[in-house]
Amino acid sequence: TATPLREEEVVRTRFLERADILMTSLMNLCFGKSARDCWNTRYPLATGPYWDGDAVVWDQGAGLSGYVALRGASVGVSAYEKKYADLTDRMFNSINRFITTDNKRSAYAVYPQNGNERYYDDNVWIGLDMAELYEQTKENRFLEKAKMVWDYLMVGNTSSCGGGILWREIPAYSNKHTCSTAPA
């Protein structure tokens, strides 16, 4: 006779089923529809006079965060573990298209080219996801990106306003936001 599932296993399975349906739908509608193979701003894909329809970095980070959480939750569940592990390279490459090197530091920028804005809060959340991916996989490439973000955050860490990390790189206003300081 089969061993009945414990309640937490039933809940986890139900959660994963629903999360998988949502992520699969989102990816089918809003991921990989352009040459950059990343998250798109709208469904259906729409371009405008200033941008090609790919989402800006905070939306890329949100998609990455959802993926990382689902990937972690799927470990040990054969129906989902391989599916989400197999997407790791694609998600990693997608977000890394937004890395720029300005002011002698590499970090994730709003758009994927040098000379545009970079925000400390967007970077800290991506850095946390990279650290989580490292914890899940033990692959150094994720740890390297988390360290890159940490090095960038330390440039924005000032003693003004009682200390903390600035919200935006340039212009470096003296304001600090919880979204950039608290997670760091």
Language model regions located:
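Residue-level recognition of alpha-helix boundary/capping or hinge positions
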Residues: 1-3, 184
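Low-complexity, Ser/Thr/Pro/Gly-enriched N-terminal "stalk/linker" regions
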Residues: 3-113, 140-164
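Well-ordered alpha-helical segments within folded domains of soluble proteins
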Residues: 52-72, 118-134, 176-184
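The feature captures the catalytic groove of carbohydrate-active enzymes
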Residues: 103, 118, 131-135, 153-184
